[in-house]
């Protein structure tokens, strides 16, 4: 999907008007009515602020912003699994009721129901796009490539709803191939079939990533040159991604298929598949300083990450027609007064609903009158 040269109309607001939790982390039971605006959650560390926005992150595909095992999410010493229910106001699809949760005891994955009808997790993207910035992402640019790749794929998923299934199917096929190789199988016909699937999916994954990076780069170019958050230049370091747009997709697919076939002995010895989009890395540079993000200061990395997420949020709103719901955990504490004010202004401009957490309410005073404030203590919320 192509980004327009400008936003022809304001993206539709999607907001949570009521959130209910049962046996989620430290919440035995919660029913929280909400307005359409921003929400600020303050309280001491360990009170449950992040747990609440983690619950909201489960209204999108995946395992939430902590990537936790479902049994770990269910409240300790509670019988059964957990349940999350959200009533959404969505101008595109009308009001929607979303429920998700698990049965507990390791019984299957989580279930999703939309308007009381069983649905897939990917169907959630038809009703809301949810993005987040959390402290665990502070080391994104200096950590392992797998974290950046996961971050990249979540960005792609927000603008290409089929991407998540492609990645899951590719990883499933790759595990099957690894298992066959490790078992010493010489069933070429079976391996050929799996590698055909990997080649097709892998090329599609690389193409989707390259397209997303091109669109994000175009969005960043449209932003003011001297904005409050530094501009990022993003590059993909991957054998397939680097050739997207240069060579025909069918040629790339055939070449990857040949690489997999020729690499069977090497991959069997290594115990894993050594080539493919599962090895791709996202390289980010701080444009004003012409410096790799990994070499920037901690504060510069944080500002760069926030700027990238906000640019992606603009793109997501433009392409989907829905202003994304943003989950911003402990974000204000890392920003000076000028950048906090700029962030709040950008959130208003985006037109979506943002949930922000922090230990110091004073950091959010500029939002007084424009946001709902709650104090969180031991899994209990009190309006302030």
From Swiss-Prot:
Name of the gene encoding the protein in the UniProt record: recF
Protein name: DNA replication and repair protein RecF
PANTHER family: DNA REPLICATION AND REPAIR PROTEIN RECF (PTHR32182:SF0)
Function recorded in the entry: The RecF protein is involved in DNA metabolism; it is required for DNA replication and normal SOS inducibility. RecF binds preferentially to single-stranded, linear DNA. It also seems to bind ATP.
SUPFAM superfamilies in the record: P-loop containing nucleoside triphosphate hydrolases
Locations listed in the record: Cytoplasm
Main location: cytoplasm
Species name: Brucella abortus (strain 2308)
GO cellular component: cytoplasm
InterPro entries with a match to the protein in the record: AAA+_ATPase, DNA-binding_RecF, DNA-binding_RecF_CS, P-loop_NTPase, RecF/RecN/SMC_N, RecF_2
Residues where ATP binds: 43-50
Coiled-coil portions: none
Key words of the record: ATP-binding, Cytoplasm, DNA damage, DNA repair, DNA replication, DNA-binding, Nucleotide-binding, SOS response
A GO biological-process term: DNA synthesis involved in DNA repair
Family stated for the protein in its record: Belongs to the RecF family.
The keyword ATP-binding belongs to this UniProt entry's keyword annotation: yes
Annotated GO MF terms: ATP binding; ATP hydrolysis activity; single-stranded DNA binding
Tree of life domain: Bacteria
